[in-house]
């Protein structure tokens, strides 16, 4: 897990933003790309380069593959309504996203780890698939046997993030109710995710 977390901070530096809003992210002090020539700064990007960079923000923020991200966008595009909000709603309904934004875990990676180790239930049934789509009214809960896991204790002590309005979190019970699909403006991103550029990227 330490290796994964260190790698994610390199991702932040490569993108030039504090993607997860963490105080210890190295991009806060070194606002240039990693590597031998990183100190030379960022190159000026073409329109496609900007779109591609925005796509990478979402890919890394949600810790999913390019294939999964593209599939999510295509599903959102086919639905009625504003494509960007459909896209965000689909990403935020992932079980790993709900758990991460509950504030019970410090990172999206730790959320995925808890889920894969069968420490998480949805409506009292164990679900070990991070991409599971949570529905409005569903209750996500961390099982009691996992309550003493260090990353949960750390997150509770630091309280770096509060649950957004579309989630109803109970820190004592380690449970969170998914109320509704959010719009882009409601998600507590710590960086400008430029969702409009992602729409352009997949609409080429």
Curated annotation (Swiss-Prot):
Family matches, as InterPro entries: Ribosomal_uS4, Ribosomal_uS4_bac-type, Ribosomal_uS4_N, S4_RNA-bd, S4_RNA-bd_sf
Gene3D superfamilies registered for this protein in UniProt: Ribosomal Protein S4 Delta 41, Chain A, domain 1, RNA-binding S4 domain
GO CC field: small ribosomal subunit
Keyword hit for RNA-binding: yes
S4 RNA-binding domain: residues covered: 93-156
Keyword Ribonucleoprotein: yes
SUPFAM superfamilies hit by this protein: Alpha-L RNA-binding motif
Highest taxon listed in the record's lineage: Bacteria
Complex and partners: Part of the 30S ribosomal subunit. Contacts protein S5. The interaction surface between S4 and S5 is involved in control of translational fidelity.
Function of the molecule: One of the primary rRNA binding proteins, it binds directly to 16S rRNA where it nucleates assembly of the body of the 30S subunit.
UniProt xrefs under PANTHER family: 30S 40S RIBOSOMAL PROTEIN, SMALL RIBOSOMAL SUBUNIT PROTEIN US4M
Family recorded in the similarity comment: Belongs to the universal ribosomal protein uS4 family.
Official protein name in the record: Small ribosomal subunit protein uS4
Organism the protein comes from: Wolbachia pipientis subsp. Culex pipiens (strain wPip)
Native organism taxonomy: Bacteria, Pseudomonadati, Pseudomonadota, Alphaproteobacteria, Rickettsiales
């Amino acid at each position: 897990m330490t290796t994964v977390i260190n790698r994610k901070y390199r991702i932040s530096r490569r993108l030039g933003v504090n993607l997860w809003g963490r105080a210890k992210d190295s991009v806060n002090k070194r606002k240039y790309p990693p590597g031998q020539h990183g100190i030379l700064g960022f190159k000026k990007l073409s329109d496609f380069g900007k779109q591609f960079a925005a796509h990478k923000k979402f890919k890394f923020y949600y810790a999913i593959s390019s294939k999964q991200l593209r599939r999510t966008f295509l599903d959102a595009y086919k639905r009625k309504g504003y494509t960007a909000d459909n896209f965000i709603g689909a990403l935020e309904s992932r079980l790993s996203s709900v758990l991460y934004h509950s504030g019970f875990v410090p990172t999206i990676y730790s959320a995925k780890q808890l889920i894969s180790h069968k420490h998480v239930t949805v409506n009292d049934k164990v679900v070990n698939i991070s991409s599971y789509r949570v529905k409005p009214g569903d209750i996500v809960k961390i099982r009691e046997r996992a309550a003493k896991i260090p990353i949960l204790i750390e997150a509770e002590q630091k309280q770096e993030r509060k649950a957004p309005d579309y989630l109803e979190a109970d820190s004592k019970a380690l449970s969170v109710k998914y109320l509704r699909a959010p719009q882009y403006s409601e998600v507590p991103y710590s960086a400008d995710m430029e969702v409009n550029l992602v729409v352009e990227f997949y609409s080429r």
